Design a protein with these regions (language model features):
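Amphipathic N-proximal alpha-helical interface segments
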Residues: 63-102, 138-162
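Long, charged/polar, surface-exposed segments that mediate recognition or autoinhibition
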Residues: 79, 84-132
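Hydrophobic helical h-region of N-terminal Sec-dependent signal peptides
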Residues: 6-15
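Intrinsically disordered, low-complexity regions enriched in acidic/Ser/Thr/Pro/Gln residues
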Residues: 31-56
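Bacterial signal peptide processing site
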Residues: 22-25
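Positively charged n-region of N-terminal signal peptides that target proteins for export
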Residues: 1-5
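Short glycine-rich, low-complexity/disordered patches
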Residues: 54-68, 117-143
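C-terminal motif of bacterial Sec signal peptides marking the signal peptidase cleavage site
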Residues: 16-20
Length: 162
């Protein structure tokens, strides 16, 4: 009798631990969010977005994008992001209501790093400091050029490859 009870308790414990492990794996799978961007009208933009999605905190999916005449746009968090390609050049514009928007740093950082993977988070942080503290409106990071423009809707960050 004790042997049966012990076996039943062990089976119950194994069942509970297997169930708990299975459900936690589903919740923690970061790859589930990061699907390849496909079916865009523009191969350069598709390639860039797939590079961006590899490490971005806020990945962009094909369904998020609205395409029109060589450009695409979407919402990333509370920011409007517009991608424009011309010849071999890519321009990314990020519209924010406030320069201090906490999402702005993360999204712009990920967009810049996707454009030039040799840049570091620290270099991007220095750029933001330059814009916020020094009042600069343009910043050159080698292959990537950034501009900041104030407009009626807040601020527009423009990121271009050189």
């Amino acid at each position: 009798m004790k042997k049966k009870l012990l076996i039943m308790l062990l089976l119950a414990a194994l069942t509970l631990s297997a169930t708990a492990c299975g459900s936690s794996k589903e919740e923690e799978d970061p790859g589930a969010q990061k699907q390849a961007v496909t079916d865009l009208d523009n191969d350069m933009l598709e390639s860039y977005l797939n590079q961006y999605n590899m490490d971005a905190e806020n990945p962009i999916q094909s369904d998020d994008l609205t395409q029109e005449d060589g450009s695409a746009s979407c919402k990333v968090t509370d920011l409007t992001v517009t991608f424009t390609t011309k010849d071999d050049d890519l321009q990314v514009a990020v519209q924010a209501k406030d320069l201090e928007d906490e999402n702005l740093d993360v999204v712009v950082r990920d967009l810049i790093i996707a454009m030039d993977s040799e840049l570091t988070y620290e270099e991007v942080k220095d750029m933001f400091s330059s814009f916020r503290e020094d009042g600069r409106t343009s910043y050159d990071m080698g292959e990537v050029k950034c501009k900041l423009k104030k407009n009626s809707d807040g601020y527009r960050f423009i990121i271009e490859n050189d």
